[in-house]
Amino acid sequence: MAEFPSKVSTRTSSPAQGAEASVSALRPDLGFVRSRLGALMLLQLVLGLLVWALIADTPYHLYPAYGWVMFVAVFLWLVTIVLFNLYLFQLHMKLYMVPWPLVLMIFNISATVLYITAFIACSAAVDLTSLRGTRPYNQRAAASFFACLVMIAYGVSAFFSYQAWRGVGSNAATSQMAGGYA
């Protein structure tokens, strides 16, 4: 029968040390911001903010078309913020069971289609809802322009998301080194 050792080395830790380790693991990946996906998401956030800020500064609640534009712009802006933070802090790697390339492709295609409808609604309603040369007219026209730009940005993201989903132009080594968002 083996004897029980007289000396046992133990190591204790406090709960604060464990919490500190999980907070330090949540560091931003600045390589993501320099990637195509990160740059396009930042562009979508800036342009989307311009769209809904310009519309929100007019009496949009009087016209249903602008209610739709506001819904699309704010909803997609918020979802893009969530996705941007998931990728910035590499939280998508912790949720490995989610097929992120497929999720991004579906989101970007849906966002493109929604922004197409918002752009058409916004630009078609400019002349009908305000007098040419007035401040609301200029804001709504500018919102139409930025809605077109953000629609193009989501379209480009949809194209790159489709390529990432299909695995076009990458191999296992480069996609691992680039963190999956080359």
From Swiss-Prot:
Disulfide bonds: none annotated. It is a multi-pass membrane protein. Residues 32-166 form the MARVEL domain. PROSITE patterns: MARVEL. InterPro entries: MAL, Marvel, MARVEL-CKLF_proteins. Residues 1-35, 90-99, 163-182 are cytoplasmic. Its main location: membrane. The keyword Phosphoprotein applies. Belongs to the MAL family. This is Plasmolipin. It comes from Homo sapiens. The lineage of its organism: Eukaryota, Metazoa, Chordata, Craniata, Vertebrata. The gene is PLLP.
